């Protein structure tokens, strides 16, 4: 009996979802293909029907976060409406939120995997760059500050968000990590020319689904 239409696409999504959680938690080098496939409820032998290598899977894990915003499972914990003219401050508030800090398995791969990417295959580096530049572009669209070129500000904001969360996650002192995140958020919102919400109002921001179109 043939598989239903879309079966292969759904299975591939399950594999990437499993890999994303495991890579975020343990890193690229410390996760086996067997673990990834088991996490998707599949056997190891089926892996190569969907990916040429672990590096190719890694590239897809990185790419799903910003390049496919309709794939909501890749946005758990950091949800942003990319159609909004207010997307810049949404990205900053959500990215540097306590929710994103706490949700390691579902966080942005750029936070969990930068050192792995630096040591990885060129394909993963290209995808990391694409994802980072997509974030820069989203931030640029709602910049109000005119003190420096928009692209410079967009790059600085993206680096402040990603780098700030990487350093916060590395802190053993949670209070210090919160202080660091808050400082990065405050500086980023000032740099973008965006008003800062009162404390405690940052959180999930909705991603439009395909069905909403």
Where are these regions (language model features)?
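Hydrophobic alpha-helical connector segments
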Residues: 60, 74-107
């Amino acid at each position: 009996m043939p598989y239903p239409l879309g079966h292969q696409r759904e299975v591939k999504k399950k594999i990437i979802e499993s890999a994303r959680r495991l890579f975020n938690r343990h890193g690229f080098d410390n996760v086996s293909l067997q673990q990834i496939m088991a996490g998707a409820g599949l056997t190891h032998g089926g892996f190569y029907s969907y990916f040429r290598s672990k590096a190719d899977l890694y590239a897809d894990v990185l790419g799903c976060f910003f390049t496919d915003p309709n794939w909501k499972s890749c946005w758990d914990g950091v949800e942003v409406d990319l159609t909004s003219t207010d997307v810049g401050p949404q990205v900053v508030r959500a990215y540097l939120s306590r929710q994103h800090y706490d949700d390691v398995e579902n966080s942005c791969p750029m936070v969990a995997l930068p050192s792995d990417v630096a040591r990885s295959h060129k394909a993963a580096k290209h995808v990391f760059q694409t994802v980072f530049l997509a974030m820069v572009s989203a931030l640029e669209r709602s910049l109000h500050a005119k003190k420096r070129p928009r692209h410079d500000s967009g790059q600085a904001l993206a680096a402040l968000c990603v780098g700030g969360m990487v350093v916060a996650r590395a802190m053993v002192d949670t209070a210090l990590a919160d202080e660091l995140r808050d400082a990065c958020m405050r500086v980023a919102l000032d740099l973008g020319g965006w008003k800062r919400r009162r404390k405690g109002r940052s959180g999930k921001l909705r991603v439009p689904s395909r069905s909403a179109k």
